[in-house]
Amino acid sequence: MPREIITIQVGQCGNQIGMEFWKQLCLEHGIGKDGLLEDFATQGGDRKDVFFYQADDQHFIPRSLLIDLEPRVINGIQNSEYRNLYNHENIFVAEHGGGAGNNWASGYHQGEQVVDDIMDMVDREADGSDSLEGFVLCHSIAGGTGSGMGSYLLETLNDRYSKKLVQTYSVFPNQMETSDVVVQPYNSLLTLKRLTLNADCVVVLDNTALNRIAVERLHLSNPTFAQTNSLVSTVMSASTTTLRYPGYMNNDLVGLLASLIPTPRCHFLMTGYTPLTVERQVNMIRKTTVLDVMRRLLQTKNVMVSSYARTKEASQAKYISILNIIQGEVDPTQVHESLQRIRERKLVNFIDWAPASIQVALSRKSPYVQTTHRVSGLMLANHTSIRHLFGKCLGQYEKLRKKQAFLDNYRKFPMFADNDLSEFDESREIIESLVDEYKACESPDYIKWGMEDPGEANVAADLDSKLVV
């Protein structure tokens, strides 16, 4: 029986990466732009109903909600070739259509006002599922709608569907460029608090690293949003292949996440992918072997999160867990040999307090998508260096907060009324504690860390109840 997953796309960024994700899924399952199965798509063996369901006229509809507070991106989707793919009852655009003005507090407040309409859609999708496993939220943490409204929805989902898994694909802003969103550090910090407390797994998509990969690996001098979004959709579709082309293991979300997240707070994952899709435009075909793919996945230049660590700190960072999803014609003995070579060469630095092993899931490739490479791989990794990304967010927040800059934008909303800025302070404390915990993971004594904090035990018990298969 399939374990269905409902995708919720919030804000401009969430809907753009969501759109690319559905295009990719349609290609891989032989589904046309109108949702009808292509004539050649007869081979089967895939599970379409994890992400799609069939209407009475047999066309496939994504289990997806498209939500935004301003109409531009969703209008673009409704006027695109894929306009007949979605269920139009699952599209929500705010009546006044003014957006959230890149303000977290505005997005959160508007989320409170329209939550009943949105949860009606969620409930309808959930009721249409035989065995709902959880939700996937696509959003960005820097703007207003994806961050603020996304935060409110995370809290509500956690409250109403407490036994269901919530995974997010969260886009972090480009830290190397000056942002046009001056309050980005505030928005990011407030969203990070909810991602820490209300999500079971966060796949971090770091725009800094995505841009770097597009420039260095794909030789694009000035990558567009569409090009970085296609990298994101590659990662999203690859991370769900074992759910859609099931094997003996890792064929549901719980199975995927259980080995990656040993402790409840440290649930932020980084990704790596090879060989990259757009590389084919550079007319470069190379021999791909399992060892080659697995070795490349461990190279920092292929990891889609920038480490802001200094050299000494970087050398102390360790992997908590790794899952490699290998697609293509692969013999399990090749996997075994590759793991042995990686171990012999000491290519991976694991933590001392848990089993040090790379998990490998083998998955079939879609028969409908032609690729020039025989083997491709996605790495999902829990790595302690991610704390430097959060440290960077904290540093930028502190700079703004010291100057009391732009706080009036937030004081207009109920949560920050009467100059009550405790929400900022609480968010900062939670993220500082998260950074400390990831740092503590590097030490062999981590198991004793945080024992004096009774709150930790409650969070752990909550996640454990969801991870009971």
From Swiss-Prot:
> Localized where?
Cytoplasm, Cytoskeleton, Microtubule organizing center
User: What does the UniProt keyword field contain?
Assistant: Cytoplasm, Cytoskeleton, GTP-binding, Microtubule, Nucleotide-binding
Q: Which SUPFAM superfamilies match?
A: Tubulin C-terminal domain-like (SSF55307), Tubulin nucleotide-binding domain-like (SSF52490)
Mostly located where? cytoplasm
SMART domains in alphabetical order = Tubulin, Tubulin_C
- Provide a GO CC annotation, any one: spindle
This entry's Gene Ontology molecular function terms read: GTP binding; microtubule nucleator activity
- Please tell me where GTP binds in this chain: 142-148
Origin: domain of life: Eukaryota
One GO biological process this protein is involved in is: cytoplasmic microtubule organization
Q: What does this protein do?
A: Tubulin is the major constituent of microtubules. The gamma chain is found at microtubule organizing centers (MTOC) such as the spindle poles, suggesting that it is involved in the minus-end nucleation of microtubule assembly.
- Family in the record: Belongs to the tubulin family.
Q: What protein name does the entry list? A: Tubulin gamma-2 chain
Question: What is the organism of origin for this protein?
Answer: Zea mays
Gene that encodes it: TUBG2
